[in-house]
Amino acid sequence: MKTIKRIMAALICMTIALTGIPISVKAADSSGTLDTNMETNSELFITLEENTDYRWNVNDSGEKGSDVHLDTGEGGNCRFRLDKIENGWYGIKHIKVNGTDRFADVKDESKDSGAKIHVWESNDEKVKGKEHRQFAFYYLGNDANGNKRYYIKNRKSGRWLGYSGNLNNNNPNIIQTEEKDRKVWLVTKSVVPLTGKETQILK
């Protein structure tokens, strides 16, 4: 029986290799699928699905130690890019206009639920060996308007990204949290996600 199972597994792998079907890794504790082909080296925006007026933004002037929070602003402090590290893990780098770009990480390398996400390191070489600066994106499918939906997970802590407290126009901090409190994020190339009204404008 074990021999038959090994043969079947080998045949499946050969079929995938020959047909070019990408191998995606399922997360045991996630309803999403680990995305190993996130877009890199492009300006991206990370928006809260439950209220798309809110997107990731970096406090103040985006200097070392500035917190990442939710904001309705559409200015320069909400631009990010992804740098591929390995095996589905990415660095999330804040793009600072006329300043220093810095990677998001978990403050104090904490594994605790509720720990803040802030920006710190600017050197690309100092991300690969630092798991608190590495994040995975679990694809949940597109929304009705074609925006890609994700859960985001930190490598070191194994916790998910959400926000502290309530929205209520108070620009809450991005934090790592328990699975039950994780949020769905839209990752887009436009500051405002697709709304479905674009086709009406074209008409």
Language-model-derived ranges and their functions:
Residues A17, H69, K93, H118-W120, ...:
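Residues in well-ordered beta-strands of folded domains
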Residues A10-L18:
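Gram-negative bacterial Sec-dependent N-terminal signal peptides
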Residues A28-E63, R79-K111, K128-L167, L186-K203:
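Extracellular glycan-recognition/adhesion modules and their associated mucin-like linkers
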Residues A17-K26:
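C-terminal segment of classical bacterial N-terminal signal peptides
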Residues M1-L11:
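Bacterial N-terminal signal peptides that target proteins for export
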Residues S61-G76, E109-E125, E131, S164-D181:
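Short, tandemly repeated low-complexity microdomains enriched for cysteine and small residues
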